[in-house]
Amino acid sequence: MTRFRPNIVVSDVFGSAGDVTAHHRDGKTYLRKRSRPVHPMTEAQAAHLEVHRRALAAWREVPDTEKERWNAYAREVEPHRPPFDHSSWLSGQNLFVSAYHGFFTLGHEHVPEAQRFEKFPPFAVKVCSGVEVEGKLVLGFSVAGLEYADASRYWVYGKLQVVMAGAGKGNAPWKSVLAAGPCSVSPVELIVPNWREVWDMDWDSFQLHGQVVLLDALNGYRSQKHRLSALVELK
């Protein structure tokens, strides 16, 4: 990585531009160029790329007056990456593409209308159960913090990894999973078909690592990521 050296014009850099991403370590900033692996994309990665291309194509068809609304709403949104000091904001295209991806994930792909980003209620997610049903891993999650919100508009969406009990995150595949129902249903269930083949798993006790967000079914937006790790013993 190349170290970034501050100057009188630019004191620091954050986020990504093109194939370069800024990383901060021990008070220093480094610029790392994104690697471009030679191996082909997985089927899931190729599908995700196609959705992204459709989102960008849809954005190009949005009238200029509507783009101005998206840009105005985007300036009110705190980015999901640092700095978290209100000194930076999203573009209207960022917000539009985020909503497009969200609706696609929820099974309702369409061109979204410009809507203000509503702050998500503070919430916490905890793994509370795990069972195997006809070769499917059914994970039960409890979601706290939505007691005074309309929980039916929020859906849990997570990237999950299963490894040997007690192990940290490794090279095992990550599986993206949308909950079987909204957060108004308790427990919230995330179901992984053929999970033993996905993770080459023979044990009934394992470590689950995850990154989860809430998706808002009204506007397609997503919350900040919550990371979790839990020991799961199948019942």
Residue ranges and their predicted role:
Residues M1-K126:
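Long, polar/Ser/Thr-enriched low-complexity segments
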Residues R75-K235:
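Charged linear interaction tracts used for macromolecular binding and regulation
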